[in-house]
Amino acid sequence: MPTFLAALLRAVLCLATLRAAMAAEPVAVILDHPRIFLTRAGLSALAARCAGAGAADYAALKRAADDAVRAGAIRWIDNKWAVPHDLLSCALVYLIEHQAGRPAQAYVDLIIRAWGDGTMIADQRGSAFGYHAIAYDWIHDALDPAQRRRYGDALGTWLTWYTGQAAITLQDGAWEYNQTWGPSHLNVMHSRDAITQKLLIALAIGGAGTAHQADAERFLASWATRIPNECIPAFDRMGGAWAESHGHGSYGPITVIPYAFEAWRTATGQNLFTAGRPWGFLPEMSHWLTWLRVPHTGRHAFIDDGGGDRYAGFASSAPLVARALRDPLAQWQALQARADGQYADGPWAALLIDPTVTASSPAQLGLPLAYLFAGAGNVFMRSAWDDPDATWAFFGAGPHFAGHQHDDEGHFLISRRGGLVGRGGGMGGNDEDFYWGGSLVFNLVTIFDPDEHPRRATRNENDGGLLRHVYEDQRCARGSITAYRDRATYTYSAADLTAGYAPAKARSVTRQFLYLRGRPGMDEYVVVLDRVVSTRAAFAKHFMLHVPAEPAQGGTVEELVPGHVARTSGVGLITTWLSRPDDFGPDAKVLSSGRSRMFMRTLLPAPASITRRGGEGHRNWGHPLEPTAQYDHTGPRRGEPPYCDWRLEVAAPLAEQTLFLHVFQIADEAVTTMAPVVLAEDAQAVRLEIGTVEQRWRVALAVSGDLGGSVTAPGMAEAEPLPVAVETRAQYAVDATPAP
């Protein structure tokens, strides 16, 4: 078990009564300033570090503050979409220079001039009110009593923002919704409850003699009660992956939730980072943001509406997570961020790195080669750490938590030396591009009921896919990982996806995903079995797969639209294509060497029909059976990364019950022939022999009942039964399946 999570588990067991104790005991905020991220007691050590080992970081910070003083202006303070980094740089330099006994008032005076009479702080048309609160706390002791009241009153007006109450209300959003917490710019846009901004303000102005003292106390009491008793259990259910979407997590929660929890810790001494379970959001966040990194670029995978970045907002909060949890993986990411220049615009964040926390990479920590984030139902797999040529894969199925979450249950991705299986290319917002809110950008099974009328159908017609819960705020069942196990030779996951489809068309939909971790480039395979039962045989079923490079089809190929659409039919069809190393776009440095090749063997249904569709004008086609959708659903950002220009559509003969069985081989580019695959079927299972005699895998997957089976690795005499339940002891030493 990873050392960090083992230690965290012990800490959690020791803190088993923390929630109840905190509910019973009033919470005291320290009297001194600063109290947000820093304390007066820690200033001496910080100043000493700035004069010693942290001199380079401090030089960058002071240079930014000095430039602002010389210019007489704080950059971006009027930009609603930007973080006013100079504001925090000046405030932090004041603290350090004052602690060192050097002149420091010029930094405070610049902030006072910018704030003026406080109107700009209180301007509800646009104000980075969360960052103003941090700066207020840091320069508090340099303000006279009148200034403290003036600016504190301006800040205090925000405590009832949007909700009309100085309390956590969860109005128009749950704990797992990004706008409940606030965006990374801590401004008014996309701020509903704005828990982070309001907490920072309540902590900053407490005791300053403002007219909002009672509101500040009410908000702190609300936090002290609701966070331990409601939020942390919700975060335990969700786990380390921000389930709403990676993109919306990076817009705010990945940054600002650690801000809130760390501000509470430094101001009260209560460490709520450790109040949850080891698989809760904050303890597991650094793992999720590590597993998201695809080896060939070192950047986060394009899983939903996010991806393509290396940190996704974690650069600013990683130092806080690292020191609150003594998390070596978060510390490793913070040091990487510093080396990558992530703190160039906001050098204040680098000074929050605690040098006493040991940094360790995934390989140094001995992290397993697969990981299940059980709450969101995210499974990540890879062949190795510290190898840009490694294989990486993702498979996902989980419940619907919050509004922006995409309906993509059963979706999977694979890469090696570039993308091999991706999601539909380009980017888009749920409002400007409804096609992006449907199923056809993901790799899943469609069941086409011609009478289905999906939500949000503008330029997003009936696609045969999942129910569209996007923008619904209530948690609901959609998909679930029912089995999971990781071994040195394989990673197995199974999911029940039935609840994700309309009951009028689907009786049962499951997917089994087996990654066979053989020798990279030679005998590495993925087996995918879909068991699909519809309510009517007439509801046609398709296996949809997005690939970045134009695939070559085996068998007799019928060109339907030359250069864009072609079809082949038969039994045991083989399709092949090359990886695309530049699938993340021209701004992403490719770390891997060469390319890889993927072979796909369609074993079931037999016979099957495979349509290859893509290229200019055909990348975003509607469902082939929907008459009103026969056009390219292009959008304003459809040409952006990730680049994934082709779709394979495997059509099954009409029947109520259909099995889709595919074997994917991940090979080196020079390999021209797929390894042998032999299929035998009986009433209980599909049975496969994969590979040459010397390196043969034997796999059995059940075709009814529990989603189990068996696997025999090359050289092994006995078959190992596959699990029918979730096994995560290698991650935590206890199973982490969240309660319903």
Regions found by a protein language model. Give the residues of each.
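Sec-dependent signal peptide recognition
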Residues: 2-14, 19
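Boundary at the C-terminal end of the N-terminal hydrophobic targeting segment
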Residues: 20-24
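Aromatic-lined, polymer-binding surfaces characteristic
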Residues: 34-285
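Ser/Thr/Asn(+Pro)-rich, low-complexity disordered segments
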Residues: 174, 219-235, 251-264, 276, ...
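N-terminal leader/propeptide and maturation segments of large enzyme subunits in energy/redox metabolism
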Residues: 302-364
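Catalytic and substrate-binding regions of extracellular carbohydrate-active enzymes
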Residues: 341-574, 642, 654-660, 666-670, ...
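Non-catalytic terminal regions with compositionally biased, polar/charged low complexity
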Residues: 518-522, 646-659, 665-740
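Polysaccharide-binding surfaces and accessory modules of carbohydrate-active proteins
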Residues: 544-617
